Amino acid sequence: MALWGGRFSGGPSEALAALSVSTQFDWRLARHDIAGSSAHAGVLHAAGLLDDDQYEGMMKALNALEEDVVSGRFVAQPEDEDVHTALERGLMERAGKDLGGRLRAGRSRNDQIIALLRRYLREEARSLAGELLGLAHVLSRQAEDVGDAVIAGRTHMQHAQPVLLAHQLLAHAWPLLRDVQRFRDLDARLDCSPYGSGALAGSSLGLDPEAVARDLGFSSSVPNSIDGTAARDVVAEFAFVAAQVGVDLSRLSEEIIIWNTREFGYVTLDDSFSTGSSIMPQKKNPDIAELARGKAGRLIGDLAGLMASLKGLPLAYARDLQEDKEPVFDQIDQLHLLLPAITGMVDTAVFNTDRMAEMAGQGFSLATDVAEWLVRQGVPFRVAHELSGACVRGAESQNKELADLTDQELIAIDPRLTPQVREVMTVQGSVRSRAGRGGTAPERVAEQITELREAIAGLRSFGEAETR
């Protein structure tokens, strides 16, 4: 069935009908659609457009329809154009055409669909936030479990400076919390109901948009009916946050993939979170991490496609906006697949801390410590940088590490390189010296774990909350 037709002499062509149908993706909004219809029935009743008996009959039919949708007894049919037309058909089957047809007064699919989408995105933002907090907690537990284990920190994928493995793991947890904060911040902009905007100009029937907003769990209704029906910036913002989550998961996954290679040998993944090869019996592949890396591109593509669809649209509604839903629906589905898998992979990973410790001091990763030791002795950093570089050159020419230079070789480079410099020529000494806030010193990392867990706890109220 269609919600239009009186102005037309005939029905749509088969090609147009096939192009227009959207129940294959918007059916997931059915529960929200029924909630909106119930709230709309309430304001029709309050405005005197439904008498008491009609309102009671309408609500009874809507409640029955919701039960049938949830149970699967009622589903969209091929002739239904979208979720709205399918549910109107279901309502009229339960309430009769006369009563069921009264619900359309004062609303348009234009305000209806964006209200449902906002409500759905608020719900999914909370659900995804809870899963992100779960992964952040697992990273904090792994960080606590590995204690003072060290690893070579890298820039440009080259040895840079030693850091605690815990510090490295926590560096992946903090972005996840910022993603949750982004979802929470977005909720303030999603928390505004477009119901009552009509097609674009509002309603002349004396309906109360604020009452509908309250019933649907929104704090307020939109102040401008044109903007209410046309705006999709909040959908694009959701898509950006979802894409950013994909990027953050991809960076974590890339590290796992590298660490899992035989050349690195830093981590062993549990069999239950790995796969094999159809031809090579020895293979144990980090497929979860690889899929996360690949799906990040898909999530970014969803965002790019949505933004391209929105570009240049005139006010108010245009059918182009039907294309706003599939990108974010796909992002939501992909993240709900990815997050439990990545969380399980990280939770069961075993880190080879001996191998990490073996590599942590290599690659002249203590050169900065030598330079900063000289600075503490009163040497200008420009000079200290040159002297430390000379130490690296001298060690490299002999195929050995900085700590292997003799006292005589150090003094020959510069008399200020006394034997006391050796106090910073150990990985442990280097790590302990980074004791400022945010640094990798053990006491700072222990404080960071506590701070992270407090931040997780503070965000739980959003991640576990439900919209009505």
Swiss-Prot record:
Q: Which reaction does it catalyse?
A: 2-(N(omega)-L-arginino)succinate = fumarate + L-arginine
Pathway the protein contributes to: Amino-acid biosynthesis; L-arginine biosynthesis; L-arginine from L-ornithine and carbamoyl phosphate: step 3/3
Q: What is its main location?
A: cytoplasm
Under PANTHER family, the record lists:
ARGININOSUCCINATE LYASE
Q: Which family does it belong to?
A: Belongs to the lyase 1 family. Argininosuccinate lyase subfamily.
Q: What is this protein identified as?
A: Argininosuccinate lyase
Q: Name one GO molecular function term.
A: argininosuccinate lyase activity
Q: Which NCBIfam families match?
A: argH (TIGR00838)
Instruction: Work out whether the entry's keyword set contains GTP-binding.
Output: no
Please give a single GO biological process term from the UniProt record: arginine biosynthetic process via ornithine
Which positions carry the signal peptide feature in this UniProt record? none
Q: Name one GO cellular component term.
A: cytosol
The alphabetized UniProt keywords are:
Amino-acid biosynthesis, Arginine biosynthesis, Cytoplasm, Lyase
